[in-house]
Amino acid sequence: MRSDLEIIDEWVQPNIRVLDLACGPGELLHHLIKNKQVNGYGLEIGHDDLNICIEKGIPVLEQNIDEGLQNFDDQSFDLVLMTHALQQFRRPDLLIDEMLRIGKECIITFPNFGHWRSRLHLALKGRMPVSDFLPYNWYDTPNIHFFTFQDFERLCKEKNIKVLRWAAVDGQLKDHWWIRSMPNLFSETAIFHISR
Amino acid sequence: MPDVIPADSVGIVTPQIAQFDTPLALSCGQSLSSYQLIYETYGTLNQSASNAILICHALSGDHHAAGYHAMSDSKPGWWDTAIGPGKAIDTNKFFVIALNNLGGCCGSTGPTSINPETGQRWEASFPIVTVEDWVESQARLADLLGIQTFAAIVGGSLGGMQVLEWSIRFPTRLQSAVIVASAPKLSTQNIAFNEVARQSIRRDPDFFDGNYIDNNSVPTNGLGLARMLGHITYLSDDAMGAKFGRQMRHDSYQYNYGIEFEVESYLRYQGEAFTKRFDANTYMLMTKALDYFDPASQTNGDLSAVLSRAQCEFLLVSFTTDWRFSPERSEEIVNALVKAGKSVSYAKIEATEGHDAFLFPIPRYMTVLNTFLTRVANRLTTEIK
């Protein structure tokens, strides 16, 4: 399993209700259902991903998150997850509000655009960074919002969202002391555990 | 007519009849002292009788879901696209049962059958049956065939309602439920459509208050009209447009009430063809069963509360252009199941065919169905090992 997912796994309590937004092929959810006995559901619109989930027996619903999540009641889940997807939605700020309405807690992971390599790429080459982790060109990328570790922290502060804990990992998804001390510069993936 | 039976067909099949002599109490308060159910089976029941799939039919369906009755048949069973060796409902893995519901007109006891108590045809006196009654009778058929638990129960439209009822009424008797293009209850508009269909039958002077056979008559106009209306609602605007557009019968307008547009001819043909194979009283009964179905009424309208009894895994499927049983209606079931903490997956299939899509072999639809059922089959084999 990707090590950002391993970190999330450590944070998740057993036997809770989990909603995984944009669950992809359900790697994390599958693990949580098997090992933490969670009552989990994924939302996804990719046909292949949906099929993989059904194949593995992961409850998955075909639902476009950008069209709203009104079908889920307030505080009806213990945990709402979103890994590496927030940057793909029309209004990440409103989506976070929705996630915190539906879930008592949320865990969100995202690529940190403040990573030194992205900064260097833009500064030296003058062009939008393309990396192994974000391998798209500006015109075909599904990632329509780029933001940094600090941007996310600031948004949480503005919205009075509590950061219960966070982690930051590099491209190999390892946790190092220098990443921890300067996450905005050194983390490639940021992981936030938040609540109201 | 098949010159040779296709390799992925279940081949020539012969319907069987099960006789039941234990009275069946119906929702309406009456009971049937004895009755018959006609059914077909495809594939082989395994030793532990754990690989059975029950197919529940929709408004105008019957027990002939797959294969051919004779080499001279012009068409195979109504869901032959999905049932067969190697198909989505794989008869190499599953023992598939399809029956004609009570009140039907294809061999199970219904309005055209003889009432044993009077020696006369039931006709208008046949009691109104509900989805609940059907599920009870289907459970008795399962008992007779030695099936305690179905691997899956599958149905589209009105068939999906039966599957939903199974999951609530007999939660331990099915491992999985596949509900396609269905709804937890009819919308007002749907009840309204059904009422127009019924009125068109009832107002046909050949209907004789339902006792038309006795009067050597058939309400073909009314039943045909009901089917024409139904047919429009089963297709999408786009599908009809793509099929017929404004294609004309003649080069110029005739300025009369004959057939001007091809769609008129199509509807008349569909209406007329239907009257040759279907009974008007059965059609009326089926529409009433649709109208009455509302399992959430047991729990003050709370669908998730009534579904909390269910124990099986669910797959729900809807189609984008279906407006008779729109995706939102399937999503009501999905949301209630999520709320109740049940295992459910849901696919919304892009399709142009409207409600009829559930009968078409749309590749992604078949893939989803097959993927879900393959897992059901794999679990059976691991359990046996």
Curated annotation (Swiss-Prot), chain B:
GO terms for biological process: homoserine metabolic process; methionine biosynthetic process. The keyword Amino-acid biosynthesis applies. GO terms for molecular function: homoserine O-acetyltransferase activity; homoserine O-succinyltransferase activity. It is found in: Cytoplasm. It comes from the Bacteria. Residues 51-359 form the AB hydrolase-1 domain. Disulfide bonds: none annotated. Substrate binds at R227, D356. GO terms for cellular component: cytoplasm. The active site is at S157, D322, H355. SUPFAM superfamilies: alpha/beta-Hydrolases. Pathway: Amino-acid biosynthesis; L-methionine biosynthesis via de novo pathway; O-succinyl-L-homoserine from L-homoserine: step 1/1. InterPro entries: AB_hydrolase_1, AB_hydrolase_fold, HAT_MetX-like. It catalyses: L-homoserine + succinyl-CoA = O-succinyl-L-homoserine + CoA. Keywords: Acyltransferase, Amino-acid biosynthesis, Cytoplasm, Methionine biosynthesis, Transferase. The record marks R324 as: Important for acyl-CoA specificity. Its EC number is 2.3.1.46. Homodimer. Transfers a succinyl group from succinyl-CoA to L-homoserine, forming succinyl-L-homoserine. Belongs to the AB hydrolase superfamily. MetX family. NCBIfam families: homoserO_Ac_trn, PRK00175.1. This is Homoserine O-succinyltransferase. It comes from Marinomonas sp. (strain MWYL1). The lineage of its organism: Bacteria, Pseudomonadati, Pseudomonadota, Gammaproteobacteria, Oceanospirillales.
